[in-house]
From Swiss-Prot:
Cofactor entry: Co(2+); Zn(2+); NAD(+)
TM helices/strands, residue ranges: none
Protein name: 3-dehydroquinate synthase
Species: Bacillus licheniformis (strain ATCC 14580 / DSM 13 / JCM 2505 / CCUG 7422 / NBRC 12200 / NCIMB 9375 / NCTC 10341 / NRRL NRS-1264 / Gibson 46)
Pathway(s) this gene product operates in, as recorded in its UniProt entry: Metabolic intermediate biosynthesis; chorismate biosynthesis; chorismate from D-erythrose 4-phosphate and phosphoenolpyruvate: step 2/7
Domain of life, per lineage: Bacteria
PANTHER family: 3-DEHYDROQUINATE SYNTHASE, 3-DEHYDROQUINATE SYNTHASE, CHLOROPLASTIC
Cell location: Cytoplasm
Amino acid sequence: MKSLQIETASLSYPVFIGGGIRKNAAELLSSLNLPMTKLLLITDEEVDKRYGEELFSLLRSKWPVKKVAVPSGEQAKSIDMFMKLQTEAIQFHLDRSSCIVALGGGVVGDLAGFVASTFMRGIDYVQFPTTLLSHDSAVGGKVAINHPLGKNLIGAFHQPKAVVYDTECLSTLPEKEMRSGLAEVIKHAFIRDESFLNELLKLDSIEAITTGQLSEMVYKGISIKAEVVSQDEREQGIRAYLNFGHTLGHAVEAEYGYGEITHGDAVALGMQFALFVSEKVLNCPVDRTKIAAWLKNLGYPESVKREVSTEALIYRMMNDKKTRGGIIQFVLLDKIGSVRLHSFKAEEIERWLNMWRLEGDK
């Protein structure tokens, strides 16, 4: 088992990474020395079938536990589901010394974390991520639910007390989910580590990724995020760099309809557009043709669907939480590992987006 310590202004907490470590859940949580009068275990219906009862039984050996499974998919990050979980917490008589346990991917982590951040003005929670994608979202304390007009518009900063990342869970993921998670790994490499990106560029297919490579990806990805979050917990500065590819990515997700495209596929499109703008504005020397061919080979979409208008995407970006005073904030690269924040008027991004989409149609 490997471990990392996340250091932020508000809290220091451990991340445990290893195969099969969920089976030591009770011991790992006990080592945190939290009061934990009761536990509310929140998972989703698919994860529940594989790991829900196992973790429930392990935790129940030491604490009173209630398990709730929400529907799988981005649609669960809704106000209705948030209120349902608050009701479950109240009816189970959670108190300020209770703890919420999130077992699942990024959706469950975001939702359960937001419930924890707001119940009785904030109680403890612990993350048990089960997907490659959630190596990113489980660390850093950003928790949220969606609004019909945009992704993650209703949320808070609320750090977990620990993250228990059992890499054994990744072995059961379908290729689509592996690809989605890999996009966030690629993002971390682009913004911070050229040698890591060069390693990733050697991947020929999702199926060829070994267990050892997965563990190393998770460790490196979390290490990069930990470094950024330790310097900027509340996204006042460099933490915004972690949004590379996400401005267009979130717009695509919202416009397609949540669940119609994976987060990672949308972010892959967003990164390709960000590289295009980086080339035009900053003369970024990244070989976009090589990157596009590699991403296509791994199964990522090449372009935004033609039936989705540029105007609709701009509207979504204008509602993005990073937009300030009608000015769209974009994360660009002047080279791999060197990030710049740039502000654009909507008409500028519309022009770049139309150019990029025309390039993709050739």
